[in-house]
Curated annotation (Swiss-Prot):
CDD domains referenced in this protein's UniProt entry, alphabetically: HATPase_Hsp90-like
Stretch list, region Interaction with NR1D1: 629-732
Signal peptide range: none
Subunit structure, interactors included: Homodimer. Identified in NR3C1/GCR steroid receptor-chaperone complexes formed at least by NR3C1, HSP90AA1 and a variety of proteins containing TPR repeats such as FKBP4, FKBP5, PPID, PPP5C or STIP1. Forms a complex containing HSP90AA1, TSC1 and TSC2; TSC1 is required to recruit TCS2 to the complex. The closed form interacts (via the middle domain and TPR repeat-binding motif) with co-chaperone TSC1 (via C-terminus). Interacts with TOM34. Interacts with TERT; the interaction, together with PTGES3, is required for correct assembly and stabilization of the TERT holoenzyme complex.
GO biological process assignments: activation of innate immune response; cardiac muscle cell apoptotic process; cellular response to heat; cellular response to virus; chaperone-mediated autophagy; chaperone-mediated protein complex assembly; neurofibrillary tangle assembly; neuron migration
Phosphothreonine: residues bearing it: 5, 7
InterPro entries: HATPase_C_sf, Heat_shock_protein_90_CS, HSP90_C, Hsp90_fam, Hsp90_N, Ribosomal_Su5_D2-typ_SF
Keyword Chloroplast: no
Name of the protein in question: Heat shock protein HSP 90-alpha
Source organism phylogeny: Eukaryota, Metazoa, Chordata, Craniata, Vertebrata
Amino acid sequence: MPEETQTQDQPMEEEEVETFAFQAEIAQLMSLIINTFYSNKEIFLRELISNSSDALDKIRYESLTDPSKLDSGKELHINLIPNKQDRTLTIVDTGIGMTKADLINNLGTIAKSGTKAFMEALQAGADISMIGQFGVGFYSAYLVAEKVTVITKHNDDEQYAWESSAGGSFTVRTDTGEPMGRGTKVILHLKEDQTEYLEERRIKEIVKKHSQFIGYPITLFVEKERDKEVSDDEAEEKEEKEEEKEKEEKESDDKPEIEDVGSDEEEEEKKDGDKKKKKKIKEKYIDQEELNKTKPIWTRNPDDITNEEYGEFYKSLTNDWEEHLAVKHFSVEGQLEFRALLFVPRRAPFDLFENRKKKNNIKLYVRRVFIMDNCEELIPEYLNFIRGVVDSEDLPLNISREMLQQSKILKVIRKNLVKKCLELFTELAEDKENYKKFYEQFSKNIKLGIHEDSQNRKKLSELLRYYTSASGDEMVSLKDYCTRMKENQKHIYFITGETKDQVANSAFVERLRKHGLEVIYMIEPIDEYCVQQLKEFEGKTLVSVTKEGLELPEDEEEKKKQEEKKTKFENLCKIMKDILEKKVEKVVVSNRLVTSPCCIVTSTYGWTANMERIMKAQALRDNSTMGYMAAKKHLEINPDHSIIETLRQKAEADKNDKSVKDLVILLYETALLSSGFSLEDPQTHANRIYRMIKLGLGIDEDDPTVDDTSAAVTEEMPPLEGDDDTSRMEEVD
């Protein structure tokens, strides 16, 4: 912009103050922060320093491809400036700065996805220090400040000032104050009762606790006093100046701080005639002290680092308020050199599997220079909960995202990171208590890994834990299951479903439990995807007890008995298949039922009832896929059950008996429900049940006392046994 235009515009811009309303959720969040009492308010400084560090990361990354970006200020640093007179604490960084649009959007008008989630967490009793994890750390400034001013300069825009006292709105204006070059200055006008955050000792304590591992120098500016020896003339001059200054500031009550040296000294000076008369005065000066001189923790020897140091670094890296659960610190040398420090958090983030979320939380450095923190190629998606840093010696400093996608070095780093993560989980599994905490939070990630990562499937399968029919309230590994297998047992049996109680009471596990065969209960939706890929474990096939062709260990006598039953019930199976027609693929005698009369099993490669339920619940499901993937259903009957035996006798006496048809359909629909399927026409099934209830209660269908409405319903109800030929089951079904 030409200089003339700038000067012409300036007076207008000075007057032009734009006011904006905070987005509703942000206003609500600020109100919550201001009006609720929080004991650990100090986290505001961690959040603001963390934001400054991110801004410095961004400008450093941009400067790798375009060094001229740093012409507006080569030094990358963070300054903390407390001012007791004005009651302000200022945080200055030489980061990327913000344009006017950034200011308006980032600080008020566009709510981040975490705003609502954080408020819900707060109201549920979560700690305020979680704020950084939800991307709204800036607003923590209002824990201690009554007003916040943000002055910022981006290379592509003018210098702007943002200001708000959190009354539901904020202002933005062009800033005509001291030019910044580039960066952001956050000025906190502290509340009267929060002046402790202007104390040197307190600021140092907070930075050491939360931010000592930030990768840029954090310098504290403190006004101090020191004794200075001057001659009488100079002292008088200084006194006069101070008096004038005090008059100007209307503080004439305070005497200038001049310290007289003791009379002994004066006598000595009198004796020494060569020396001029001297006095000591207090001189004010600004002391600068760098607060984070610790070198990057990942470059140090793991043996020299304490658990506390790892904990402090983890917290400064992640803004987590809890300790990490486990840590892995290693370096790889040889053809390729890199160091890595990986952490497992104590709990999964609220948006772990959100698509919009960045794909990983590992910061990539090249020779101690931060490059990026969302490099998707660095670690697979199923390990996206791992936090940490990777520092490579071999990648070029100015590497772009496109180059990273093709980089062979990165592929090797990725392979090593996955290997070390699995090592870490295996080590963690040795401590039952800690592994239980880990598994509660991240079992879905392990199962997703089994589905996606064929190379590491075997190792990941060793990390799985499940409830079984023999484990009670304790989860066991597949290895534990194998050690308890019966001598003649060839397979690992499992059942999928919604809850532990539901699968434990399922008809499918009756025979297995009776024979003392352990069944694994898989009760998470992701288990269905997991077992599609996990076909075997330690040479033993995983077999679903809800699918056809279930082989159970049995001796010759049992086999012979089963064959006899098949022959005896062959005719009934044929009659039932004719009645059910296309509803089922076939009707067979079951070897898995004990107390239930029948069940519906699915074909070997089709979906289980549970998978069908999951797929039907998908918002974006493809109905054409549903048609051919929904499994072919097989009806299995229990030859030892009295209902089935009586039905056989009735069918053989008169296969055209209407009641046989009704009962077969009722049995089929009830078996569908108990096997976990849903009914296509639940109303018809309900009407059949109501009709049976009426028969059981002895209510006569032709009773004139029955009102018209119930008569109308009765007309729609399907017939039951004993009805005459005019009512036809076919018409209903």
